[in-house]
Each structure stands twice: as C-alpha cells, then as structure tokens.
Design a protein with these regions (language model features):
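Helix-termination/interfacial motifs at the ends of transmembrane alpha-helices
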Residues: 2, 6-19, 125-202
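Large intracellular
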Residues: 10-135, 205-249
Length: 249
C-alpha cells in the first residue's frame, strides 16, 4: 500500500507535475462522500464504523504460524500423556492462543468431545463470518468508488460544456473533471482492493490455524500418542513445510 502511494507520487513528480494540482475539494466530496453514503445505505452503520479494526488487523496484524501451533499442541499432548490431561490446567499460562485455552479447558473439565467440537466449530464460523463481512464492505467500496468517480467526471463535463463560450477554460475544466475518475481508481486499486485481498488471505491463514487447533484438542482429549497427534496435524501443512518440521524434530 505504502509502496503504491510512493510510486504514484514519484511518477507525478518525475513527470514534472504538481501533486497539489491533483487535490480538488469538490471531487473529494463527490467520490469519498458518495462512496461513504452508498456504504451506509447498503450496510449497517455499526459494521462500517468497525471496519477500521478489520483494516488495521489485515495490514499490521502478524500472520498466525501453523507450524508453531502444531509444536505447542504436540508439547501439550506430551504433558497430557505423561502427567494426565488434568495437568494441562497448570500450563494454561503457556498457551498463547485463547482458542487453544478454551479448547483445552473444556477437555480438562471432561466436556463431551462432540460438544467441544461444536463449540469450537461455531466460534470458527463466527470468525469467518466477521472476516467475510469486513471483506464485503471493502469490496463494495472498491466497486462504488469508480462509479462515483465517473459520476463526478460526468458532472465536470456537463459544467464544462455549459461554458464552451470560453475556450481557455476547456482544458482546466477537463482536467478537473478527470480528477474524480482518478480518485475512484485509486480508492479501488490502491486502497480497498489490496486490503480486501489481504484480509481474505489472512482469513485463510487464521482458519487453517484454528482448524489445526480443533484437531489437536480433540486428539489430545482422546489420549492419542504425541507422535500420532503430530502426524495428524502435519497433514494440514504443505509438503515443504511439513518436511522442514519433521527434519527439525
């Protein structure tokens, strides 16, 4: 995102252009205000107001590490095998992922395995729904912004054609008219589009890790040998990453 902005700015300067000439308040109102208004009409206001948390997590959040998660689960399986599953209650502080904590606590409490799976699956589905909702808003903004950019351009052309008696104003008028199209394209292709794609990728990563956790918790509760737990969980990883973990072990 930052690289794209820097590249565009550098291209403007290197081309001899003045970045300040690309700032037009009426165009900003048409594109940004129009897009915001359309989003408010299409989605609940609460969801829109929370979109910044989704954006920050997608851009600045650290990606979950499935390999480390597997190592942690295998370690907990070894403890449960050696000291009994109840001993895991003394190692809750070592569990970095709250999802693991919830699963292990239910296993320690003797909760029915099917109920544990149902609860964890429901939480995973809720996570996926939240991510899908955030991505849908960003995708919608990416579709709407170019449309409002075109609306602004058409408005500018109409105003320009109404003043055809002054030929000297045609060039500047056309330039201002096209600025709104540029704003819409930038919003769609530099801001909302890339962030939505990254959110989709981050969602896949989190779903993978939580799927691994569910499988690990169920395997630990059933009393599987730690080697069996590791073998089960490694099947979720790509072959190259799986081989690297096996060699390290």
């Amino acid at each position: 995102l930052v690289l794209a902005v820097v590249a565009i700015g550098a291209a403007i300067v290197m081309g001899g252009g003045n970045p300040a000439s690309l700032i037009d308040v009426p165009s900003i109102l048409v594109v940004f205000g129009g897009t915001a208004g359309a989003l408010i009409a299409a989605y609940p206001l609460g969801s829109i107001l929370k979109i910044h948390t989704v954006v920050l997590k997608a851009v600045f959040g650290s990606a979950p590490d499935p390999a480390q998660t597997i190592k942690d689960l295998v370690k907990f399986a070894e403890i449960a095998r050696r000291e009994g599953i109840l001993s895991l209650e003394n190692h809750v502080e070592d569990m970095k992922d709250p999802f693991i904590v919830r699963g292990i606590k239910m296993a320690v409490d003797g909760t029915d395995p099917e109920l544990i799976r149902t609860i964890l699956d429901t939480e995973l589905e809720a996570l996926m729904d939240r991510h899908a909702g955030g991505k849908a808003i960003l995708d919608a903004a990416g579709r709407m912004a170019p449309a409002f950019g075109m609306i602004g351009t058409l408005m500018g052309l109409i105003f320009m054609l109404q003043n055809m008696d002054d030929p000297s104003a045609i060039g500047p008028g056309m330039a201002v008219a096209l600025i709104t199209t540029m704003y819409g394209a930038i919003i769609a292709n530099v801001i909302t589009g890339p962030i939505a794609e990254k959110l989709g990728a981050r969602d896949s990563e989190e779903v993978l890790v939580k799927t691994v956790i569910i499988a690990g918790v169920m395997s630990i509760q059933s009393g599987d040998n730690p080697r069996v737990v590791e073998s089960k969980l490694l099947t979720y990883l790509p072959p190259a990453q799986r081989a690297a973990i096996e060699q390290a072990a």
